[in-house]
Amino acid sequence: MRYVDEYRAPEQVMQLVAHLQQRARLLPHTAARPLRIMEVCGGHTHAIFKFGLDQLLPENIEFIHGPGCPVCVLPMGRIDACIEIASRPGVIFCTFGDAMRVPGNNGSLLQAKARGADVRIVYSPMDALRLAQQNPQREVVFFGLGFETTMPATALTLRQARERNVDNFYFFCQHITLLPTLRSLLDQPENGIDAFLAPGHVSMVIGTEAYGFIASDYHRPLVVAGFEPLDLLQGAVMLVEQTIAQRSDVENQYRRVVPDEGNPLAQAAMADVFRLDGDSEWRGLGVISDSGVQLTPAYQRFDAEAHFRPAPQRVCDDPRARCGEVLTGRCKPHQCPLFASTCNPQSAFGALMVSSEGACAAWYQYRSQENEV
Protein backbone atom coordinates (compact mmCIF):
# COMPACT_ATOMS: atom_id res chain seq x y z
CA MET A 1 0.00 0.00 0.00
CA ARG A 2 1.52 3.30 -1.09
CA TYR A 3 2.58 5.63 1.75
CA VAL A 4 2.59 2.69 4.17
CA ASP A 5 4.59 -0.26 2.84
CA GLU A 6 7.24 1.95 1.27
CA TYR A 7 7.89 3.51 4.68
CA ARG A 8 8.30 0.09 6.31
CA ALA A 9 10.66 -1.57 3.81
CA PRO A 10 13.12 -3.59 5.96
CA GLU A 11 16.13 -3.07 3.70
CA GLN A 12 15.65 0.71 3.73
CA VAL A 13 15.15 0.66 7.50
CA MET A 14 18.44 -1.15 8.00
CA GLN A 15 20.25 1.21 5.61
CA LEU A 16 18.97 4.16 7.62
CA VAL A 17 19.95 2.48 10.89
CA ALA A 18 23.48 1.96 9.56
CA HIS A 19 23.64 5.62 8.54
CA LEU A 20 22.38 6.67 11.97
CA GLN A 21 25.02 4.51 13.66
CA GLN A 22 27.72 6.15 11.56
CA ARG A 23 26.58 9.71 12.22
CA ALA A 24 26.07 9.05 15.94
CA ARG A 25 29.83 8.55 16.32
CA LEU A 26 30.22 12.29 15.78
CA LEU A 27 27.96 13.17 18.69
CA PRO A 28 29.47 14.37 21.97
CA HIS A 29 27.02 12.08 23.79
CA THR A 30 27.96 8.72 25.30
CA ALA A 31 26.16 5.60 26.44
CA ALA A 32 26.27 6.99 29.98
CA ARG A 33 24.76 10.28 28.83
CA PRO A 34 22.94 9.64 25.55
CA LEU A 35 21.21 12.13 23.28
CA ARG A 36 17.69 12.02 24.73
CA ILE A 37 15.02 12.50 22.07
CA MET A 38 11.50 12.97 23.41
CA GLU A 39 8.68 11.85 21.14
CA VAL A 40 5.62 13.89 22.06
CA CYS A 41 2.94 11.69 20.56
CA GLY A 42 1.33 8.48 21.71
CA GLY A 43 1.26 7.31 18.09
CA HIS A 44 5.02 7.71 17.91
CA THR A 45 5.48 5.84 21.19
CA HIS A 46 3.32 2.96 19.98
CA ALA A 47 5.19 2.74 16.67
CA ILE A 48 8.59 2.84 18.38
CA PHE A 49 7.68 -0.15 20.56
CA LYS A 50 5.76 -2.02 17.84
CA PHE A 51 8.65 -1.90 15.38
CA GLY A 52 11.41 -2.10 18.01
CA LEU A 53 13.00 1.12 16.81
CA ASP A 54 14.45 1.99 20.20
CA GLN A 55 16.42 -1.27 20.09
CA LEU A 56 17.97 -0.26 16.75
CA LEU A 57 19.37 3.02 18.04
CA PRO A 58 23.08 3.57 18.71
CA GLU A 59 23.95 3.26 22.38
CA ASN A 60 24.39 7.03 22.69
CA ILE A 61 20.86 7.87 21.51
CA GLU A 62 17.71 7.24 23.55
CA PHE A 63 14.00 7.76 22.95
CA ILE A 64 12.08 9.10 25.96
CA HIS A 65 8.32 9.25 26.05
CA GLY A 66 6.43 12.51 26.52
CA PRO A 67 2.85 13.49 27.45
CA GLY A 68 1.43 13.14 23.95
CA CYS A 69 -1.52 10.87 24.75
CA PRO A 70 -4.58 12.95 25.78
CA VAL A 71 -6.34 10.01 27.41
CA CYS A 72 -3.24 9.37 29.52
CA VAL A 73 -3.34 12.83 31.12
CA LEU A 74 -7.05 12.79 32.02
CA PRO A 75 -7.32 13.85 35.69
CA MET A 76 -9.28 11.55 37.97
CA GLY A 77 -11.51 14.42 39.06
CA ARG A 78 -12.64 15.05 35.49
CA ILE A 79 -13.65 11.42 35.12
CA ASP A 80 -15.61 11.66 38.38
CA ALA A 81 -17.43 14.76 37.10
CA CYS A 82 -18.32 12.91 33.90
CA ILE A 83 -19.66 9.96 35.89
CA GLU A 84 -21.79 12.32 37.97
CA ILE A 85 -23.37 13.80 34.85
CA ALA A 86 -23.74 10.44 33.10
CA SER A 87 -25.57 8.98 36.11
CA ARG A 88 -28.36 11.55 36.02
CA PRO A 89 -31.80 10.50 34.74
CA GLY A 90 -32.50 11.35 31.12
CA VAL A 91 -28.85 11.80 30.13
CA ILE A 92 -27.14 10.02 27.24
CA PHE A 93 -23.40 10.38 27.76
CA CYS A 94 -21.16 9.87 24.72
CA THR A 95 -17.41 9.60 24.38
CA PHE A 96 -14.63 7.82 22.54
CA GLY A 97 -13.78 4.23 23.42
CA ASP A 98 -10.38 5.00 24.95
CA ALA A 99 -11.97 7.21 27.60
CA MET A 100 -14.36 4.51 28.83
CA ARG A 101 -11.83 2.62 30.95
CA VAL A 102 -9.85 5.53 32.41
CA PRO A 103 -10.14 5.16 36.20
CA GLY A 104 -11.38 8.01 38.34
CA ASN A 105 -11.76 8.02 42.10
CA ASN A 106 -15.29 6.61 41.72
CA GLY A 107 -14.60 4.07 39.02
CA SER A 108 -14.66 4.47 35.26
CA LEU A 109 -17.33 5.41 32.73
CA LEU A 110 -17.49 1.74 31.76
CA GLN A 111 -18.29 0.84 35.36
CA ALA A 112 -20.87 3.64 35.48
CA LYS A 113 -22.48 2.08 32.41
CA ALA A 114 -22.56 -1.29 34.19
CA ARG A 115 -24.34 0.43 37.09
CA GLY A 116 -27.08 1.65 34.75
CA ALA A 117 -25.87 4.95 33.31
CA ASP A 118 -26.58 5.41 29.59
CA VAL A 119 -22.98 5.75 28.41
CA ARG A 120 -22.30 5.18 24.72
CA ILE A 121 -19.18 4.93 22.58
CA VAL A 122 -19.18 7.16 19.51
CA TYR A 123 -16.64 7.48 16.72
CA SER A 124 -17.09 11.20 16.11
CA PRO A 125 -18.82 14.14 17.83
CA MET A 126 -21.30 14.20 14.94
CA ASP A 127 -22.56 10.79 16.11
CA ALA A 128 -23.45 12.38 19.46
CA LEU A 129 -25.19 15.30 17.74
CA ARG A 130 -27.28 12.87 15.68
CA LEU A 131 -28.25 11.07 18.88
CA ALA A 132 -29.44 14.38 20.32
CA GLN A 133 -31.59 15.03 17.26
CA GLN A 134 -33.00 11.50 17.37
CA ASN A 135 -33.79 11.76 21.10
CA PRO A 136 -35.21 15.27 21.67
CA GLN A 137 -36.62 14.23 25.07
CA ARG A 138 -33.14 13.28 26.34
CA GLU A 139 -30.10 15.42 27.19
CA VAL A 140 -27.09 14.24 25.19
CA VAL A 141 -23.57 15.06 26.42
CA PHE A 142 -20.45 14.61 24.33
CA PHE A 143 -17.23 14.24 26.31
CA GLY A 144 -14.68 15.77 23.96
CA LEU A 145 -10.99 15.32 24.61
CA GLY A 146 -7.74 15.50 22.75
CA PHE A 147 -5.16 17.93 21.48
CA GLU A 148 -5.52 20.21 18.47
CA THR A 149 -5.91 17.06 16.36
CA THR A 150 -9.51 16.48 17.46
CA MET A 151 -10.54 20.06 18.23
CA PRO A 152 -11.59 20.94 14.64
CA ALA A 153 -14.09 18.05 14.51
CA THR A 154 -15.61 19.18 17.81
CA ALA A 155 -15.70 22.79 16.61
CA LEU A 156 -17.50 21.86 13.39
CA THR A 157 -20.01 19.75 15.34
CA LEU A 158 -20.81 22.63 17.69
CA ARG A 159 -21.23 24.89 14.69
CA GLN A 160 -23.76 22.41 13.29
CA ALA A 161 -25.57 22.22 16.63
CA ARG A 162 -25.86 26.00 16.70
CA GLU A 163 -27.03 26.25 13.08
CA ARG A 164 -29.64 23.52 13.63
CA ASN A 165 -30.68 25.04 16.97
CA VAL A 166 -30.29 21.73 18.81
CA ASP A 167 -31.14 22.58 22.41
CA ASN A 168 -30.55 19.19 24.07
CA PHE A 169 -26.90 18.78 23.07
CA TYR A 170 -24.05 19.59 25.48
CA PHE A 171 -20.29 19.41 25.38
CA PHE A 172 -18.00 18.48 28.29
CA CYS A 173 -14.67 20.03 27.36
CA GLN A 174 -11.42 18.24 28.05
CA HIS A 175 -9.52 19.53 25.05
CA ILE A 176 -5.98 20.56 25.88
CA THR A 177 -3.23 22.27 23.94
CA LEU A 178 0.21 20.89 23.21
CA LEU A 179 2.51 23.91 23.10
CA PRO A 180 2.08 25.06 26.74
CA THR A 181 2.87 21.50 27.76
CA LEU A 182 6.18 21.52 25.92
CA ARG A 183 7.02 24.87 27.47
CA SER A 184 6.17 23.48 30.92
CA LEU A 185 8.45 20.48 30.38
CA LEU A 186 11.34 22.67 29.28
CA ASP A 187 10.86 25.02 32.22
CA GLN A 188 11.48 22.17 34.65
CA PRO A 189 15.06 22.17 35.95
CA GLU A 190 17.20 19.27 34.78
CA ASN A 191 14.49 18.10 32.38
CA GLY A 192 17.03 16.02 30.46
CA ILE A 193 15.40 16.65 27.06
CA ASP A 194 17.91 17.23 24.27
CA ALA A 195 15.60 17.21 21.23
CA PHE A 196 12.00 16.63 20.17
CA LEU A 197 10.16 14.50 17.65
CA ALA A 198 6.94 16.48 17.26
CA PRO A 199 3.59 14.84 16.44
CA GLY A 200 2.47 14.70 12.83
CA HIS A 201 -1.26 14.82 13.56
CA VAL A 202 -1.21 17.92 15.75
CA SER A 203 1.24 19.59 13.37
CA MET A 204 -1.10 18.94 10.45
CA VAL A 205 -3.48 21.39 12.18
CA ILE A 206 -1.16 23.93 13.82
CA GLY A 207 1.73 23.75 11.34
CA THR A 208 5.45 23.75 12.08
CA GLU A 209 5.92 27.47 12.65
CA ALA A 210 4.13 27.21 16.01
CA TYR A 211 7.12 25.32 17.45
CA GLY A 212 9.55 28.16 16.78
CA PHE A 213 9.89 29.10 20.46
CA ILE A 214 11.41 25.70 21.25
CA ALA A 215 14.34 26.46 18.98
CA SER A 216 14.64 30.18 19.69
CA ASP A 217 13.92 30.30 23.44
CA TYR A 218 15.09 26.88 24.63
CA HIS A 219 17.68 26.02 21.95
CA ARG A 220 16.37 22.50 21.35
CA PRO A 221 16.22 20.93 17.88
CA LEU A 222 12.76 19.77 16.82
CA VAL A 223 11.62 17.66 13.88
CA VAL A 224 7.99 17.03 12.94
CA ALA A 225 7.87 13.35 11.94
CA GLY A 226 5.44 10.79 10.57
CA PHE A 227 4.48 7.49 12.13
CA GLU A 228 6.18 4.81 10.07
CA PRO A 229 9.62 3.32 10.85
CA LEU A 230 11.40 5.27 8.13
CA ASP A 231 9.70 8.48 9.24
CA LEU A 232 10.85 8.12 12.82
CA LEU A 233 14.38 7.02 11.96
CA GLN A 234 14.77 9.82 9.44
CA GLY A 235 13.51 12.24 12.08
CA ALA A 236 16.17 10.92 14.47
CA VAL A 237 18.86 11.36 11.78
CA MET A 238 17.74 14.96 11.22
CA LEU A 239 18.00 15.66 14.96
CA VAL A 240 21.45 14.08 15.09
CA GLU A 241 22.61 16.25 12.19
CA GLN A 242 21.34 19.36 13.95
CA THR A 243 23.12 18.35 17.14
CA ILE A 244 26.40 17.68 15.34
CA ALA A 245 26.17 21.09 13.66
CA GLN A 246 25.18 22.71 16.97
CA ARG A 247 21.94 23.97 15.45
CA SER A 248 18.50 24.34 17.02
CA ASP A 249 15.95 24.53 14.23
CA VAL A 250 12.40 23.39 13.51
CA GLU A 251 12.41 20.96 10.58
CA ASN A 252 9.63 19.08 8.84
CA GLN A 253 10.21 15.44 7.92
CA TYR A 254 6.48 14.82 7.35
CA ARG A 255 6.05 17.16 4.39
CA ARG A 256 3.79 14.73 2.55
CA VAL A 257 1.12 15.52 5.16
CA VAL A 258 2.12 18.59 7.19
CA PRO A 259 2.29 22.06 5.59
CA ASP A 260 4.39 24.56 7.50
CA GLU A 261 1.38 26.86 7.94
CA GLY A 262 -0.91 24.05 9.11
CA ASN A 263 -4.59 23.93 8.17
CA PRO A 264 -6.04 27.47 8.06
CA LEU A 265 -9.65 26.25 7.82
CA ALA A 266 -9.26 24.06 10.90
CA GLN A 267 -7.54 26.88 12.75
CA ALA A 268 -10.40 29.26 11.88
CA ALA A 269 -13.03 26.80 13.14
CA MET A 270 -11.12 26.34 16.39
CA ALA A 271 -10.77 30.10 16.89
CA ASP A 272 -14.51 30.56 16.35
CA VAL A 273 -15.59 27.96 18.91
CA PHE A 274 -12.73 27.75 21.43
CA ARG A 275 -10.62 30.15 23.41
CA LEU A 276 -7.46 29.41 25.32
CA ASP A 277 -8.28 30.46 28.83
CA GLY A 278 -6.61 29.69 32.11
CA ASP A 279 -4.75 26.74 33.48
CA SER A 280 -5.60 23.07 33.08
CA GLU A 281 -4.90 20.08 35.29
CA TRP A 282 -3.05 17.18 33.71
CA ARG A 283 -2.95 13.77 35.30
CA GLY A 284 0.54 13.02 36.55
CA LEU A 285 1.78 16.51 35.66
CA GLY A 286 -0.31 18.81 37.83
CA VAL A 287 -1.60 22.19 36.67
CA ILE A 288 -0.10 23.56 33.45
CA SER A 289 -0.43 27.28 32.83
CA ASP A 290 -2.34 28.54 29.79
CA SER A 291 -3.22 25.06 28.53
CA GLY A 292 -6.96 25.23 29.27
CA VAL A 293 -9.62 25.37 26.54
CA GLN A 294 -13.05 26.95 26.97
CA LEU A 295 -15.99 27.70 24.69
CA THR A 296 -16.32 31.19 23.25
CA PRO A 297 -19.42 33.20 24.32
CA ALA A 298 -21.31 32.30 21.14
CA TYR A 299 -21.22 28.62 22.14
CA GLN A 300 -21.58 28.87 25.92
CA ARG A 301 -25.08 27.41 25.85
CA PHE A 302 -23.59 24.04 24.92
CA ASP A 303 -21.31 23.96 28.00
CA ALA A 304 -22.18 20.78 29.92
CA GLU A 305 -20.48 21.92 33.12
CA ALA A 306 -22.40 25.21 33.18
CA HIS A 307 -25.67 23.37 32.54
CA PHE A 308 -25.30 20.39 34.89
CA ARG A 309 -23.01 21.99 37.47
CA PRO A 310 -21.26 18.83 38.71
CA ALA A 311 -19.54 19.11 42.07
CA PRO A 312 -15.93 20.26 41.67
CA GLN A 313 -13.58 17.31 41.85
CA ARG A 314 -9.88 17.48 42.65
CA VAL A 315 -8.37 14.07 43.26
CA CYS A 316 -4.68 13.53 43.96
CA ASP A 317 -2.82 10.84 42.05
CA ASP A 318 -1.78 7.78 44.02
CA PRO A 319 1.85 8.33 45.05
CA ARG A 320 2.68 4.69 44.40
CA ALA A 321 2.27 5.18 40.65
CA ARG A 322 5.03 6.87 38.67
CA CYS A 323 2.79 8.10 35.83
CA GLY A 324 4.12 11.65 36.01
CA GLU A 325 7.72 10.48 35.78
CA VAL A 326 6.92 8.29 32.78
CA LEU A 327 5.10 11.18 31.09
CA THR A 328 8.11 13.46 31.49
CA GLY A 329 10.70 10.89 30.44
CA ARG A 330 12.20 10.54 33.92
CA CYS A 331 11.61 6.80 34.12
CA LYS A 332 10.61 3.90 31.90
CA PRO A 333 7.22 2.17 32.35
CA HIS A 334 8.67 -1.05 33.74
CA GLN A 335 10.43 0.92 36.50
CA CYS A 336 7.08 1.75 38.12
CA PRO A 337 6.45 -0.63 41.06
CA LEU A 338 2.85 -1.18 39.93
CA PHE A 339 3.71 -2.08 36.34
CA ALA A 340 2.26 -5.40 35.11
CA SER A 341 1.18 -6.53 38.58
CA THR A 342 -1.27 -4.04 40.06
CA CYS A 343 -1.46 -2.08 36.80
CA ASN A 344 -2.03 -3.96 33.55
CA PRO A 345 -4.43 -3.66 30.58
CA GLN A 346 -6.99 -5.94 32.22
CA SER A 347 -6.97 -3.96 35.47
CA ALA A 348 -5.49 -0.55 34.74
CA PHE A 349 -4.40 1.49 37.73
CA GLY A 350 -3.19 4.45 35.71
CA ALA A 351 -4.36 6.02 32.46
CA LEU A 352 -1.05 5.24 30.73
CA MET A 353 -2.09 1.59 30.76
CA VAL A 354 -5.60 2.26 29.40
CA SER A 355 -4.98 3.87 26.03
CA SER A 356 -3.32 1.84 23.30
CA GLU A 357 -1.09 4.89 22.77
CA GLY A 358 -0.02 5.04 26.41
CA ALA A 359 3.65 4.31 27.03
CA CYS A 360 2.84 1.71 29.70
CA ALA A 361 0.32 -0.12 27.49
CA ALA A 362 2.78 -0.16 24.59
CA TRP A 363 5.61 -1.41 26.81
CA TYR A 364 3.34 -4.09 28.29
CA GLN A 365 2.22 -5.26 24.84
CA TYR A 366 5.62 -5.38 23.19
CA ARG A 367 8.14 -5.67 26.04
CA SER A 368 6.41 -7.45 28.92
CA GLN A 369 8.52 -10.56 28.29
CA GLU A 370 11.66 -8.60 29.09
CA ASN A 371 12.84 -8.61 32.68
CA GLU A 372 14.68 -5.32 32.70
CA VAL A 373 15.65 -3.61 35.91
Residue ranges and their predicted role:
Residues F143, F147-A210:
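Phosphate/pyrophosphate-binding betaalpha-module
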Residues E6, C72, F143, F147, ...:
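Hydrophobic alpha-helical scaffolding
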Residues M1-Q137, M151, A155, R159-R164, ...:
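Metallocofactor- and cofactor-centric catalytic cores in central/energy metabolism, strongly enriched
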Residues Q234-E325:
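Internal helical hairpin/lid segments
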Residues F172, E190-P259:
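A conserved active-site cap/scaffold subdomain adjacent to cofactor or substrate pockets
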Residues I92, E139-V141, A195:
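Structural motif
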